[in-house]
């Protein structure tokens, strides 16, 4: 910028030749010039009629060594001495690698004339838009996308675009060049192992990657809903001081248009700073009748939950609605949020109003009125005060008020109010602004005012534009014409002149509005007075967002517009501009029920394009130069009028206003017990009369009271008085599945063709409109296709791009597909192998008569169900007219992968039938386990001869589930510290680093710290340019916000506590000092008085004579303390505070005389203790304090406390280890022991979880500080330039990566299914990190539930149905949780996470009593009432006893039926140490209702059939035996001896020795060793097999069980087993015939085989 300043000074010193004297030459160019784009400029001569040839040239800045473009134009009187040449600046000739802003010099020369202007460059050479086929995807699915590209003239542009896909963490995982003209763009396939969240598809031009365009989409596991729920509040806001209740209407419609019958569960709540605070009492059960229902939030319910309602103003009400169909078959959860809690229903803004006015001339005040949710408020009367004017808002929320301004004023104060007749005066919205008078040049008093009175402007309109002038007569007489420019989309679109007749003060012209002016334009005009003065004005004009061209999608005929049948043939017709390229996609509307925010639309396209407008205001300007600057233009004249130099292509953004902080007080009971006069004692009594969920005696409850003896006495008296009273209820509902015992005439199931094609999107086609256009210039094309099988409404979306009219998004065309009778098979997203699950087939009857339906579940060997290979499962139901019925099927998936479930149904006496076949995803059992290996690639220090080679060993996969896949992802990234820093700046990623929510004085410091350290690091290393200089502003604002908020908790003596009314905390005050001292290096306006006041308080109030610091009030949030809590507390606290004093020393030394002596006393105390410390953590912390004080240079004690000289660890304290090791690193850096620091840094970086976050706050903060200080202290890195080669087994070609500065933060990733050794080599300069993530499924062992440091017991029992229960509850259970801490002292700050049973909700009243009474058992609780998935309750405990069980008990209530309830879980864990945790499961009916299956290891076979055998018939003879043994599917016939019977799980294993192979089969050598026959335990009695007996046995090939190298045999109903008498028994007359038959059977089959 210094070079530019010097250049501008030099330019101003250039003299103008005499021949131009007396004329005014004006040169205008866009304020920002785009590369590779034709840009129009203007040169005008006023007062000179001599023809001239003008040379226009563009040069590099500042040296002007290159001519980037040149042209020559003629200026002559015939053209009005005005020319508008175009210039183009080629990007290829510029230094695009420069991190600094780039400029060019645009020069106009002619004999006797030279004008030039330095103009900012932009590499934005066009617009790119990405359309994805959907806005939401599941793992493993393809993301189809197409690219639309056009230049700034809205002309189609088919140059290459780079498309990148980025994970929610910002990691680029794919980057490919794409030709927008191609219709065969390969989709991006999401991996199965994928990050959930919002992904980005980013497009950028290949030759200008600085400008990018983004499409967003979500990735998560989901199932499409069967219907749509809309929630419509009665108002878009809630009056906080109103008296009326708040109503919401609920509408539920199937996606094919029919109305839903069912029930809705509605829960209201308030969202405060992003955190949801539910109102448990508002949970209501609402009937949905004919698709509609209404819920109400009663005013008194809200006020009971939040006592101080005014604290809610500015926050949002939300309502969560769960709708369940009458059949219980389907459920949809939706939430309506953004219902603002307000004191006035409207908000007024002046966003489209100029800030400047012309005294004595009309001032157009554009008032914009919105509802609290930001939507436009139509038909609202508004009125301005001081200068009276009134109007009414239009549909877009705007109203234009014309104010006639007085003469001779410099500012104009304006107040506008709404004037709604139904609102009292105090509820009318009001907004004030001050407009400033336009400053005339040299105080001439000459003005120009452009007036455009029309508001809703659209293409095809003729817009009147008025030019008003005011000034002295001599000046006005010189005006012969107005020169005007029309700017749109950042370009000068048109230049013209409007003549003015003598004496005309008002001149009007008509401007035709063409599609080129969409979405908005600026109209700027000026006139000249003499040869020096320019008088200018401008106005911004909005144009209705429509297509520049035409695109319509409709049915090709009237038949195509009707309701269609699945699979039917139909046609659509496309109508649009000739030559248009049209992209089509059909999307199931159910997708938009889940997510519609990312759908491409015409408005979104224009919103993006409008950002290319380089103008920054709604019009006008501070003075004549300001008019040009604010319109986005650069001006230079021959009389040295020059606009200011622009240095940013973007307009300056207003600072975000800081939201009002609101501390919401939770409700507490204030009812009174009349017999106790004292209010506090009334509370104790009332709490004593509450029912205790745990069933504790009054005497035990009294032990929890901390309020004193008087309270205990009152509590005990009232508790004993009310003892034994319960108030519960229960209401039973049972789901009854009707069955029919008769068979009738049904359409044959074998003739039913099942529907099986259910895509979420399809019709992904690109069509060209090349047909001859009709008389209206429209081309059309008919597209035939066959519909897919879904019963739904398809939304066909068409997007076109034409050669000259840009992009057009057509109105979606809907195709509704349904049948009068059909099946909807509802499947979960996935199920776990070998775990039972219920699926439902919902049968819909949309005819006017009741029907009888036979339903069949088809057999699939991949599932165990009531349908078997030999027996169909059928059931018959009656469905009433215009209703539905759910038929549940219980299955057990036996094989991993995608498997078909098929259900068919036919209507008795009719040809109506339907079948559905869907794929169900079966995932492996066990628990997903991740193994992360991190390897630092640093060839300069770790390599030999400049190359680092490393063997990466295969992981030990402990307890891997057999026959399951392994996923290994290998990713390589540059400099990891930079990655951590970058993620810390990003607000979304910052939230992942911080566990505790912000709010109180402690939480606020947790939130503020990472930004301070990150900003300090980036400032020191000068890396802001690589991350985006604008992000520093974000970080500084974050720090300032944290600083300002922390001052709320500062006491008068400069100490701090979580809340002002709590005792001051030494640790927190020191922490504030530490963080604020660091913040002064990046935010200079932090007051030294604030920091030094805290230091002085610590010295005077908390330091003892021996130098030690004391803590009288520990912090609430113990996780802040990190490792400082625990053993050796005095040393830890003193060292921590000494570090804070040392880091603030440079700020406070001259303000606090006793600071040095305080530091010396504390350091002396630590020196005496240092060599005797036991904990590695305390040793590291103390070492850093002493090294920072300059008293420690010997690292022997520190290194002796380490493990392997690279870490300081303690048992089961992972996060403390990171923190302690980081303190050790800081100590080594202070001692300048860099060689010792290197392995420490490597260990620290290796501990980072995959994705880049540490586990706990202090560990992250200190770890981050250590790594940042290491980067600062170590010598600067060489330029990053690494070549990495990975050699994977079974891949012939090695994988090669090049990492340099351009892609350092891009994760370059490869995947493999193998877990084998591989090698990696790195050469070059710089560092990189290779992360190997191996994911597999580990078996859940019986000891997997072993708990660490906690004992936990969970039980559940049913409550008597005669007792009272919650309204709408079908069943009530009591959940009891008992836990004990297994450490030496009580555990503090413990969390219990309860995962609810599906369909159940916790009783909020019970939980409130546990948290609100004087006998308080829990600190607080949070409820997540998502019944669609498992809800959860989070319970916070201040402590858990180490000497006795702490028990909690509360009710949970079933609100809807679930066919098969999966177990819930309870997890208890320490907030300070996540390794200390325990999990237990609970279930109301454990061990009941399970299908029978036989398992060996993790392989299971279905056994859901009777225990009858094939040979259990009345009469059997030799011929029947031969006939049955020789049936085609019989695999073997043996004579075998039963050796023993083994029991395993629910199966019996009969171990048999094959004595004779009568008919050989699959088992090639069955006599080699005993064979196992497996049967259900329940069949033991029916089989009645005896050890040491011989048997004739045969079975089917389908009953063989292949397990690796051996075969087992299943005993099923198809198995033939007969006892074969021994030799002695065969002599008896009773068995002689049987023995002869067996011998003859054996001889016949052995010698002759089976007959043909």
From Swiss-Prot:
A UniProt-annotated Pfam family: A2M
Domain Anaphylatoxin-like as annotated: residue spans: 684-719
Cell compartment(s), UniProt: Secreted
Gene Ontology molecular functions: endopeptidase inhibitor activity; metal ion binding; toxin activity
Function per UniProt: Complement-activating protein in venom. It is a structural and functional analog of complement component C3b, the activated form of C3. It binds factor B (CFB), which is subsequently cleaved by factor D (CFD) to form the bimolecular complex VF/Bb. VF/Bb is a C3/C5 convertase that cleaves both complement components C3 and C5. Structurally, it resembles the C3b degradation product C3c, which is not able to form a C3/C5 convertase. Unlike C3b/Bb, VF/Bb is a stable complex and completely resistant to the actions of complement regulatory factors H (CFH) and I (CFI).
Quaternary structure, from the entry: Heterotrimer of alpha, beta and gamma chains; disulfide-linked. Is active with factor B in the presence of factor D.
UniProt protein name: Venom factor
């Amino acid at each position: 910028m210094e070079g530019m300043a010097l250049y501008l000074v030099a330019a101003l010193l250039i003299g103008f030749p005499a021949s131009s004297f007396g004329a005014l030459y004006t040169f205008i160019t866009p304020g920002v010039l785009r590369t590779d784009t034709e840009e129009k400029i203007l040169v005008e001569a006023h007062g000179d009629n001599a023809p001239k040839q003008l040379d226009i040239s563009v040069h590099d800045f500042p040296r002007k060594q290159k001519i980037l473009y040149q042209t020559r134009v003629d200026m002559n009187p015939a053209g009005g001495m005005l020319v508008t040449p175009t210039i183009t600046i080629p990007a290829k000739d510029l230094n695009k690698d420069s991190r600094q802003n780039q400029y060019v010099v645009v020069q106009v020369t002619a004999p006797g004339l030279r004008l030039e202007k330095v103009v900012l460059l932009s590499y934005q050479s066009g617009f790119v838009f990405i359309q994805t086929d959907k806005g939401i995807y599941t793992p493993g699915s393809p993301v189809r996308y197409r690219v639309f590209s056009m230049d700034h003239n809205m002309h189609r542009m088919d140059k290459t675009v780079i498309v990148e896909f980025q994970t929610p963490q910002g990691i680029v995982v794919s980057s490919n060049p794409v030709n927008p003209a191609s219709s065969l763009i390969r989709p991006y396939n999401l991996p199965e192992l994928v990050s959930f969240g919002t992904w980005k598809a980013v497009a950028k031009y290949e030759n200008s990657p600085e400008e990018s365009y983004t499409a967003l989409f979500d990735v998560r596991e989901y199932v499409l809903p069967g219907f749509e729920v809309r929630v419509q509040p009665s108002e878009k806001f809630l009056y906080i001081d109103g008296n009326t209740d708040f109503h919401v209407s609920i509408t539920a419609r199937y996606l094919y248009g029919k109305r839903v019958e069912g029930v809705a569960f509605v829960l209201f709540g308030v969202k405060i700073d992003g955190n949801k605070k539910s109102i448990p009492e508002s949970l209501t059960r609402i009937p949905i009748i004919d698709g509609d229902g209404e819920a109400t939030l009663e005013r008194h319910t809200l006020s009971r939950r939040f006592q101080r309602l005014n604290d809610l103003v500015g926050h949002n009400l939300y309502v969560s609605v769960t709708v369940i169909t009458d059949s219980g078959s389907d459920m949809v959860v939706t939430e309506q949020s953004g219902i603002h809690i307000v004191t006035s229903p409207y908000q007024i803004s002046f966003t489209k109003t100029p800030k400047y006015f012309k005294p004595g001339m009309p001032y157009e005040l554009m008032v914009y009125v919105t509802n609290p949710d930001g939507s436009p408020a139509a038909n609202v009367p508004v009125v301005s005060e001081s200068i009276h004017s009134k109007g009414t808002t239009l549909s877009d929320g705007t109203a234009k008020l014309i104010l006639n301004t007085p003469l001779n004023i410099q500012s104009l104060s304006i107040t506008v109010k709404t004037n709604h007749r139904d609102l009292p005066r105090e509820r009318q919205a009001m907004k004030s602004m001050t407009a400033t008078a336009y400053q005339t040049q040299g105080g001439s008093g000459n003005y120009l005012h452009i007036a455009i009175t029309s508001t809703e402007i659209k293409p095809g309109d003729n817009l009147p534009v008025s030019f008003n002038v005011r000034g002295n007569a001599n000046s006005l007489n010189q005006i012969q014409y107005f020169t005007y420019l029309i700017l749109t989309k950042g370009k000068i679109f048109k230049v013209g002149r409007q003549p003015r007749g003598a004496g005309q003060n008002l001149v009007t012209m008509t401007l035709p509005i063409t599609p080129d002016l969409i979405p908005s334009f600026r109209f700027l005009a000026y006139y000249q007075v003499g040869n020096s003065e320019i008088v200018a004005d401008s106005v911004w004009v909005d144009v209705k967002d429509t297509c520049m061209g035409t695109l319509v999608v409709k049915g090709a005929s009237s038949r195509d517009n009707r309701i269609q049948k699945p699979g039917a043939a139909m046609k659509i017709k496309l109508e649009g501009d000739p030559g248009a390229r049209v992209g089509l996609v059909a999307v199931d509307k159910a997708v938009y029920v889940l997510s519609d925010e990312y759908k491409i639309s015409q408005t979104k396209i224009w919103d993006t394009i409008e950002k290319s407008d380089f103008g920054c205001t709604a019009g006008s300007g501070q003075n004549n130069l300001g008019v040009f600057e604010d319109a986005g233009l650069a001006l230079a004249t021959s009389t040295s009028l020059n606009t200011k130099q622009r240095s940013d292509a973007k307009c300056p953004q207003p600072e975000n206003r800081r939201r009002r902080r609101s501390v919401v007080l939770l409700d507490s009971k204030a009812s009174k017990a009349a017999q106790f006069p004292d209010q506090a004692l009334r509370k104790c009594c009332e709490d004593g009369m509450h029912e205790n969920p745990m069933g504790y005696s009054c005497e035990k409850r009294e032990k929890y009271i901390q309020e004193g003896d008087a309270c205990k006495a009152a509590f005990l008296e009232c508790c004993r008085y009310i003892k034994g009273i319960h108030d519960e209820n229960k209401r039973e509902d049972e789901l009854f599945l009707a069955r029919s015992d008769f068979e009738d005439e049904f359409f044959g199931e074998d003739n039913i063709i099942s529907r099986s094609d259910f895509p979420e999107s399809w019709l992904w086609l690109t069509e060209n409109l090349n047909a001859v256009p009709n008389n209206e210039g429209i081309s059309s094309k008919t597209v035939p296709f066959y519909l897919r099988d879904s019963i739904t409404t398809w939304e066909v979306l068409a997007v076109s791009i034409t050669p000259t009219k840009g992009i057009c998004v057509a109105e979606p065309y809907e195709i509704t597909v349904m049948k009068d009778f059909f099946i909807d098979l509802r499947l979960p997203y996935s199920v776990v192998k070998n775990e039972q699950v219920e699926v439902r087939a919902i049968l819909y009857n949309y005819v006017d008569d009741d029907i009888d339906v036979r339903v069949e579940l088809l057999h699939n060997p991949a599932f165990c169900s009531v349908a078997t290979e030999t027996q169909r499962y059928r059931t018959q139901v009656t469905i009433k007219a215009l209703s539905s019925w759910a038929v549940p099927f219980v299955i057990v998936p036996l094989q991993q992968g995608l498997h078909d479930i098929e259900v068919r149904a036919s209507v008795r006496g009719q040809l109506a039938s339907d079948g559905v076949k869907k794929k169900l995803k079966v995932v492996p059992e066990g628990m997903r386990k991740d193994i992360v290996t991190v390897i630092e690639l640093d060839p300069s220090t770790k390599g030999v001869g400049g190359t680092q080679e490393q063997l990466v060993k295969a992981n030990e996969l402990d307890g891997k589930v057999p026959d399951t896949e392994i996923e290994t992802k290998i990713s390589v990234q540059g400099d990891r510290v930079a990655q951590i820093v970058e993620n810390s700046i990003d607000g979304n990623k910052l939230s992942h680093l911080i566990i505790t929510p912000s709010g109180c004085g402690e939480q606020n410091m947790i939130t503020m710290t990472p930004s301070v350290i990150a900003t300090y690091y980036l400032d020191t290393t000068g890396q802001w340019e690589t991350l985006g200089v604008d992000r520093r502003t974000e970080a500084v604002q974050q720090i300032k916000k944290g600083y300002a908020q922390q001052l709320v908790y500062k006491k008068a003596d400069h100490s701090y506590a979580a809340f002002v009314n709590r005792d001051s905390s030494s640790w927190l005050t020191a922490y504030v000092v530490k963080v604020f001292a660091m913040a002064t290096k990046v935010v200079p306006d932090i007051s030294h008085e604030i920091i030094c006041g805290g230091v002085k308080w610590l010295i005077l109030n908390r330091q003892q004579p021996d130098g030690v610091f004391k803590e009288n009030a520990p912090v609430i949030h113990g996780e802040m303390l990190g490792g400082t809590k625990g053993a050796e507390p005095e040393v830890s606290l003193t060292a921590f505070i000494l570090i804070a004093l040392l880091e603030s020393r440079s700020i406070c030394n001259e303000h606090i005389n006793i600071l040095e002596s305080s530091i010396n006393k504390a350091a002396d105390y630590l020196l005496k203790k240092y060599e005797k410390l036991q904990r590695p953590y305390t040793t590291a912390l103390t070492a850093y304090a002493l090294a920072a004080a300059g008293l420690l240079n010997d690292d022997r004690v520190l290194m002796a406390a380490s493990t392997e000289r690279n870490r300081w660890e303690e048992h089961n304290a992972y996060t403390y280890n990171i923190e302690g090791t980081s303190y050790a690193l800081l100590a080594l850096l202070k001692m300048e022991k860099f060689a010792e620091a290197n392995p420490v840094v490597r260990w620290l970086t290796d501990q980072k979880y995959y994705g880049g976050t540490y586990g706990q706050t202090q560990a992250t903060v200190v770890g981050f500080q250590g790594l940042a200080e290491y980067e600062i202290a170590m010598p600067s890195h060489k330029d990053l330039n690494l070549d990495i080669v990975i050699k994977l087994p079974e891949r012939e070609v090695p994988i090669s990566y090049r990492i340099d500065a351009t892609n350092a933060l891009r994760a370059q990733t490869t995947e493999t299914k193998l877990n084998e050794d591989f090698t990696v080599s790195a050469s070059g300069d710089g560092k990189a990190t290779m992360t190997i993530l191996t994911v597999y499924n580990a078996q859940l062992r019986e000891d997997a539930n072993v708990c660490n440091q906690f004992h936990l017991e969970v039980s559940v029992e049913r409550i008597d149905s005669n007792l009272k229960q919650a309204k709408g509850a079908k069943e009530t259970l009591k959940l009891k949780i008992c836990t004990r801490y297994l450490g030496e002292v009580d555990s503090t700050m413990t969390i219990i996470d309860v995962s609810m049973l599906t369909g159940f909700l916790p009783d909020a009243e019970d939980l409130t009593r546990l948290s609100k009474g004087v006998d308080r058992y829990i600190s607080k609780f949070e409820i997540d009432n998502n019944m669609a998935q498992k809800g959860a309750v989070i319970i916070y405990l201040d402590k858990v006893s180490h000497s006795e069980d702490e028990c909690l008990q509360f009710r949970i209530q079933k609100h809807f039926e679930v066919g098969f309830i999966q177990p819930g879980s309870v997890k208890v864990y320490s907030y300070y140490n996540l390794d200390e945790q325990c999990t237990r499961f609970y279930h109301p009916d454990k061990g009941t209702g399970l299908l029978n299956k036989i398992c060996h290891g993790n392989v299971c076979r279905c056994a859901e059939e009777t225990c009858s055998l094939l040979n259990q018939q009345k009469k059997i003879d030799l011929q029947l035996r031969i006939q049955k043994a020789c049936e085609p599917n019989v695999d073997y016939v043996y004579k075998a001896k039963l050796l023993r019977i083994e029991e395993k799980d629910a199966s019996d294993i009969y171990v048999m020795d094959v004595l004779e192979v009568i008919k050989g089969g699959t088992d090639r050598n069955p006599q080699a060793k005993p064979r196992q026959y497996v049967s259900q335990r329940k069949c033991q009695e029916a089989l009645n097999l005896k050890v040491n007996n011989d048997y004739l046995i045969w079975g089917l090939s389908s009953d063989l069980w292949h397990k690796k190298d051996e075969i087992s045999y299943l005993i099923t109903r198809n198995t033939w087993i007969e006892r074969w008498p021994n030799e002695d028994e065969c002599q008896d007359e009773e068995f002689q015939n049987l023995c002869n038959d067996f011998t003859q059977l054996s001889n016949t089959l052995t010698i002759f085989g089976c007959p043909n």
